[in-house]
Amino acid sequence: MSTLYVSPHPDAFPSLRALIAARYGEAGEGPGWGGAHPRICLQPPPTSRTPFPPPRLPALEQGPGGLWVWGATAVAQLLWPAGLGGPGGSRAAVLVQQWVSYADTELIPAACGATLPALGLRSSAQDPQAVLGALGRALSPLEEWLRLHTYLAGEAPTLADLAAVTALLLPFRYVLDPPARRIWNNVTRWFVTCVRQPEFRAVLGEVVLYSGARPLSHQPGPEAPALPKTAAQLKKEAKKREKLEKFQQKQKIQQQQPPPGEKKPKPEKREKRDPGVITYDLPTPPGEKKDVSGPMPDSYSPRYVEAAWYPWWEQQGFFKPEYGRPNVSAANPRGVFMMCIPPPNVTGSLHLGHALTNAIQDSLTRWHRMRGETTLWNPGCDHAGIATQVVVEKKLWREQGLSRHQLGREAFLQEVWKWKEEKGDRIYHQLKKLGSSLDWDRACFTMDPKLSAAVTEAFVRLHEEGIIYRSTRLVNWSCTLNSAISDIEVDKKELTGRTLLSVPGYKEKVEFGVLVSFAYKVQGSDSDEEVVVATTRIETMLGDVAVAVHPKDTRYQHLKGKNVIHPFLSRSLPIVFDEFVDMDFGTGAVKITPAHDQNDYEVGQRHGLEAISIMDSRGALINVPPPFLGLPRFEARKAVLVALKERGLFRGIEDNPMVVPLCNRSKDVVEPLLRPQWYVRCGEMAQAASAAVTRGDLRILPEAHQRTWHAWMDNIREWCISRQLWWGHRIPAYFVTVSDPAVPPGEDPDGRYWVSGRNEAEAREKAAKEFGVSPDKISLQQDEDVLDTWFSSGLFPLSILGWPNQSEDLSVFYPGTLLETGHDILFFWVARMVMLGLKLTGRLPFREVYLHAIVRDAHGRKMSKSLGNVIDPLDVIYGISLQGLHNQLLNSNLDPSEVEKAKEGQKADFPAGIPECGTDALRFGLCAYMSQGRDINLDVNRILGYRHFCNKLWNATKFALRGLGKGFVPSPTSQPGGHESLVDRWIRSRLTEAVRLSNQGFQAYDFPAVTTAQYSFWLYELCDVYLECLKPVLNGVDQVAAECARQTLYTCLDVGLRLLSPFMPFVTEELFQRLPRRMPQAPPSLCVTPYPEPSECSWKDPEAEAALELALSITRAVRSLRADYNLTRIRPDCFLEVADEATGALASAVSGYVQALASAGVVAVLALGAPAPQGCAVALASDRCSIHLQLQGLVDPARELGKLQAKRVEAQRQAQRLRERRAASGYPVKVPLEVQEADEAKLQQTEAELRKVDEAIALFQKML
């Protein structure tokens, strides 16, 4: 057994890191050594057993005599190997290592330095402003990184997040008050997101952020008896309070300004600027091409850019598979791509989860279309049986005071169709605003005649084969809806004990989460013997038909063949012996109610027990004696409890953790009821679906979901497909009555008396044949019920293409290429499409399934209207005020109490509303968030960063068009002319890599890889490097070099915009239309222009990349030195010292680029062995090149020396204090281990700072 030794101190951050890692290891694949999870020990290990003196915490012992590991980093890695982010050397793994190191060396010293003195755990002679400045400098890289990232390495917590969060626990608990947290907004958002994850909460509990009122003393650990304080201690505390008040005053000042010498982050400046609203006002009739002949606006405006393009695309037929070919059946060597949309419910509007689905599907569709494939993305909408009926019923009651029963079936259905026509277009409007390249001429609604015919055909065929059948079984029943509901429509509410819940139809709340015990008297017992049973649903005891005990339970062996007496009914209940009973739970005896519990039903089947239903469809009691007859079920609960007490049979009540099933539409408590329903036999179809994945005929990605697929298919149950609703596909089955005395009347559960038919005439002929009578003796009554919505949805890939008719679309596009959807409906929708498709056509409906993660809010919470975190994509596109968000809640169906709760949630998450981000930024951001995990914690505010990216594209293209000039003519091909400069070759090489990564990522459904490649190319390579190096070339006298640069620049724009187009269709179309064309016959729109292929862009150039890598390394070093010496407005000369002639030649070749990129003066390469000029600061660019930056004459050496000497004295004093503190008697024993580690890290940091100061002093002394 392995043991994890940790500190009991509540703020021991190294131990907390290990404990959280252990939690993640439990939830994942387990510890790195493959053994059992370790036991936790809240004390140091015995020194006699550890290989490292003194004992350090956390420490991990892998069994007696096994491997010992100590230290937070090593222990956490071993407990949670998956937290490393991937295999060594991968991008994620490198990022994890980087941030873990940063947390250990930068965050922990800064956090302790800022927090411990304030808590009185360490004295500090430093100015509190300087202490907070050090913390601010440590937080700055985090703040900038987290501006565009949810977590430090990927889209889920890793060991990097564990290390950084635990390092910052002290500041967030005791130092960073609300004003400070607003300064570090991104860090705060990330910190709160992390500590709300279940694994963090299990260890940390509820993390309370510092409110501004700090305790005067900090109690680190269990409370101890207070000792009398001496006069000296009281005097010392008074001084502490005085210093604390001064510290807090200075802290408030500090929080309003950046740390000394530090600039405000540029993104903050950009976010504070009001970009204004620029609109496109030229008169353009819908469907006509947008006029882009005028000048480009000064800055990017989503409303300007997105205007007019979509109607033109639609009018031109770019989204139709017929575009560019005579018909869809025409042979296409590039292949066919077909995908159908997961049909959204017609009930309302799309949210950000739908927007994620849409962004992924449209980017894939546009990529396939640009590759020249015959492409169809088919739109559609689902009638959403229960959801729609509930919404319209509420509307009807609110506006007319009528129920659907008062209105009647036909009139009610007319109201639903009317509502559908009024509201149904909103979803399609949203989809179009999202840029969805759907073929709208093929749009379908699941209640359309074409799709309804397919539903009827499927039901009739399956019924004729015996796959669909009629049976009486237990179903999930909503008494409020008066209908059976599917498993996906049942929410599971977990209770820890006694809880009062609101139930529709009851004025008072109902008690749940308790276990009631009562006694059944044994029949014929002379000793008044009884059997005690317990239940959470005491009202169901009126339906009890037996008591069950385990066959091996010795306590009840003497009761074999005996009965117990029901106290309220004239029947005795047999005592049955069944192995399902848990002997160790309660008394080991269980009441059996087959008509109201699934386990009891199965016991009843095994023992031939009667199933007595005691509730009608509305939840009122039936088949019971007065006074219980007719009582609502939860009124009966109280009445039964009173009656048991009156008869002396009540034995107790206790809290009981339980799960209450709730209907997610009506919020009613779901009851298991016996009802005759229609079922689908799924066994053989499930085996075929499972085998298709095993053989590889059907690929499910990510592959981790295949295990879930097989588990569901191997354990599938019969599918109940009937619903007691009016809105939906009415079941094409008819109950038969035969007007012939020779034929006895039938009963509902008897399947022989039910026939199906495509119409009533066909059903009548079937019935006449079945009973051997003439059709005129047959009376038919069609079933009032409708089919489960998932049944018609399961036929969607077939029905939209015209099945069962052999249409042209069916022959070309079935089976489809891909089904893309969220992993949460893998069983409810995907599995049923596969089963029905295979059964009805003998072919799979699609060849691949890609399952994306589920969108949650920035705090990891499920999207819920009552939390106020359900966001309309259009509100992100256009922006909305906080009041606007509130107004949406007022117009919803939420209860007033839920509205107030949702308002608070909106106020917390969007205090200033949601800024206008635009469609392109939203789509790109959602795809960038994608990871092959199960959840995405989406921070809407992060989308704004991608609007800034759009602005960068805009400005870069605007600059490029000026550089190209009005008379520029692109060369006929994109191939280089042979006279390109080093930086021209480099950017082409980087463009080649972006093209390779983009195509590779699309093929692998690795959307973050695609977005990262494109973002990096445009922002970090084209804008930050190439355009800067281009400026002197375009303004120079070398016309050959300038022309080569212009052709290369044009190629970068042309290829770069095509790369981005699937994600950002609007801004790329706008910019593309402003570029000159290589050929007059080029496609009219970017969306039908060929996507860049590696074969087209094969310009990989390792030599140029090595040269520019040296240039960029030198540039980074020069920029760092300029920042150190505050030379932001001066262009200092730079001298490069190289180790060999090859490096010298390379440095000489890139010196001009360094001059442009680093804003340097002269950039010269020193001869081998030549000394650098006096008065230079030195930095390393690589192991073969050093930079000497000329400071002589640019700074005042005497003044700088004075500042450095003072800094040196303070650093020496601080180092000496730390050495004395660590050398003090009892330090290893009395001081907490985490404080010792922080002191050690602080000493190392201070000594490194001293060495740097000494080097600077030596430099400036030479300059005097």
From Swiss-Prot:
Motif ('HIGH' region): 344-354
Reaction equation(s) it catalyzes: tRNA(Val) + L-valine + ATP = L-valyl-tRNA(Val) + AMP + diphosphate
Keyword Transport: no
GO terms for biological process, alphabetical: tRNA aminoacylation for protein translation; valyl-tRNA aminoacylation
Domain of life, source organism: Eukaryota
Compositionally biased region (Basic and acidic residues): 234-248, 261-275
Residues that bear N6-acetyllysine: K645
A Pfam family assignment: Anticodon_1
Signal peptide: none
Enzyme class: ligase
Keyword field contains S-adenosyl-L-methionine: no
Residue(s) carrying Phosphoserine: S437, S527
Region named Disordered: 217-296
Residue interval(s) of motif 'KMSKS' region: 862-866
GO cellular component terms given for this protein: cytosol; endoplasmic reticulum
Classification via InterPro entries: aa-tRNA-synth_I_CS, aa-tRNA-synth_Ia, Anticodon_Ia_Val, Glutathione-S-Trfase_C-like, Glutathione-S-Trfase_C_sf, GST_C, M/V/L/I-tRNA-synth_anticd-bd, Rossmann-like_a/b/a_fold
UniProt EC number: 6.1.1.9
Activity regulation behaviour: Can be regulated by protein kinase C-dependent phosphorylation.
PANTHER family per UniProt: VALINE--TRNA LIGASE (PTHR11946:SF109), VALYL-TRNA SYNTHETASES (PTHR11946)
Disease per record: Neurodevelopmental disorder with microcephaly, seizures, and cortical atrophy: An autosomal recessive neurodevelopmental disorder characterized by severe developmental delay, intellectual disability, severe microcephaly, and cortical atrophy.
Functional summary from the UniProt entry: Catalyzes the attachment of valine to tRNA(Val).
Family label: Belongs to the class-I aminoacyl-tRNA synthetase family.
Name used for this protein in its record: Valine--tRNA ligase
Organism field: Homo sapiens
